[in-house]
């Protein structure tokens, strides 16, 4: 769901969405000034626990200080299906600043049917806000999002206990204990994870003059926790440029725009790149780069950008491919991976599987079917097992050693793994 990001000389506001990173362009465009370190964060958690409301509350609170543009719940949840069902389906990108950092914030879907979209969003985060409804406690997707956060490599979590205005004070301590136990169970330091207690809906209705403990004061505390508890990430700016493609659209007479988060390296306007994947393009020039509606002379690892590719048609670039420095990565169909298979209690399968099993593999932004071949020592792999096995994908996909992936079957997350060897 993307509308135009780049335009001709028209005084028109344009919006790019990965469901929606708002990127506007007018006849006179501003340049993005890097005055603060850039960090990618996001909201994860069970459906209806308040992720999108919290995202809106953060922008509302910070907008009164000139550090954000307020985005309402309706502006964040834009698609007709989302509006009709009142849930987030894809992952929304917005921006805001604290006193010391520039944040790109990804609001991830919590509904089970859209976990696959959450995987792509979570894989871009340097840290995440796990939103848990204090009256309800941790639920099915709370656990699944924690597991997926670990598997896609999110290094740090912050917990926001939401809806405190409707919570039983005697039960809040139990809910916090349950969440800490879940975090510890799945590889995070539950004892040391910071918790912020608040009510996002209350914060949305308040002003600075009427701020209360669970309202705006809780949002202020949350932003301070992000600044101090989410480590500044190391950016691989010295490696060859690589950006997984999230969304693609075309501008008549100008070319095709591909959007995504830069995984490594830097890119300057005018440089040539390659498109690697199902429809490879050996070389194409980048004639424009933007981030959150502002022009960039160059982009670097960690930034969510749109790249204007000269002369390409929209159908020549696909989600799941990568844009890279020419000659630095190839598309492959076969690899070995060290993989963990989730148990039923973790949201996985009830039964194991054997050679010939064909689930979906989520690798970067790609979603591709692959056939699993177990080693001769194993006739079957069971839930809870860890094993290295071979995967053969049905279409060429850009792969990297130590690259992470998730395995899905229907509405189940089957497992997750790390690529150990590329075989072709």
From Swiss-Prot:
GO terms for biological process: mitochondrial translational elongation; translational elongation. Its main location: mitochondrion. GO terms for molecular function: GTP binding; GTPase activity; translation elongation factor activity. The keyword Glycosyltransferase does not apply. Residues 86-90 are annotated as: G2. Residues 36-234 form the tr-type G domain. Residues 45-52 are annotated as: G1. GTP binds at residues 45-52, 107-111, 162-165. One of its GO terms (cellular component) is mitochondrion. InterPro entries: EF-Tu_GTP-bd, EF-Tu_GTPase, EFTu-like_2, EFTU_2, G_TR_CS, P-loop_NTPase, Small_GTP-bd, T_Tr_GTP-bd_dom. Keywords: Elongation factor, GTP-binding, Mitochondrion, Nucleotide-binding, Protein biosynthesis, Transit peptide. Residues 162-165 are annotated as: G4. Belongs to the TRAFAC class translation factor GTPase superfamily. Classic translation factor GTPase family. EF-Tu/EF-1A subfamily. This is Elongation factor Tu, mitochondrial. It comes from Dictyostelium discoideum. The gene is tufm.
């Amino acid at each position: 769901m993307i509308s135009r990001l780049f335009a001709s000389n028209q005084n028109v506001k344009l919006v790019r969405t990965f469901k929606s990173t708002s990127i506007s362009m007018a006849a006179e465009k501003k340049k993005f000034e890097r005055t603060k370190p850039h960090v990618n964060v996001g909201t994860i958690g069970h459906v209806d626990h308040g992720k999108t409301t919290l995202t809106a509350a953060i922008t509302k609170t910070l907008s009164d200080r000139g550090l954000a543009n307020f985005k309402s719940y309706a502006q964040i949840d834009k698609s007709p299906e989302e509006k009709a069902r009142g849930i987030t389906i894809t992952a929304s990108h917005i921006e805001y600043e604290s006193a010391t950092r520039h944040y790109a914030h990804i609001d991830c879907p919590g509904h089970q049917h859209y976990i696959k979209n959450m995987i792509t969003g979570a894989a871009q985060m340097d840290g995440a806000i796990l939103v848990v409804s204090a009256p309800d406690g941790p639920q099915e997707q709370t656990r699944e999002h924690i597991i997926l956060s670990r598997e896609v490599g999110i290094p740090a979590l912050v917990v926001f206990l939401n809806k405190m205005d409707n919570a039983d004070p005697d039960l809040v301590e139990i809910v916090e204990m349950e969440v800490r136990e879940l975090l510890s169970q799945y590889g995070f330091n539950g004892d040391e994870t910071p918790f912020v207690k608040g009510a996002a809906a209350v914060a949305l209705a308040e002003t600075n003059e009427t701020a209360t403990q669970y309202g705006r004061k809780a949002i202020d505390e949350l932003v301070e926790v992000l600044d101090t508890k989410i480590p500044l990430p190391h950016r691989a700016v010295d490696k060859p440029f690589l950006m997984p493609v999230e969304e693609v659209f075309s501008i008549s007479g100008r070319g095709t725009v591909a959007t995504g988060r830069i995984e490594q390296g830097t890119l300057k306007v005018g440089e040539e790149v390659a498109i690697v994947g199902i429809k490879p393009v050996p070389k194409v020039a980048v004639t424009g780069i933007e981030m959150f509606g502002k022009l960039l002379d160059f982009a670097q690892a960690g930034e969510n950008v749109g790249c204007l590719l000269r002369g390409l048609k929209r159908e020549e670039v696909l989600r799941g491919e990568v844009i890279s420095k020419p000659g630095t990565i190839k598309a492959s169909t076969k690899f070995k991976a060290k993989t963990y298979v989730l148990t039923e209690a973790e949201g996985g399968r009830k039964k194991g599987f054997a050679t010939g099993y064909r689930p979906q593999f989520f690798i970067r932004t790609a979603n591709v079917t692959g056939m699993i071949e177990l080693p001769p020592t194993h006739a079957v792999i069971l839930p809870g097992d860890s094993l290295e096995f071979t995967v053969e994908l049905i279409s060429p996909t850009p792969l990297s050693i130590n690259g992470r992936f998730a395995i899905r079957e229907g509405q189940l997350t089957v497992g997750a793994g790390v690529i150990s060897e590329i075989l072709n």
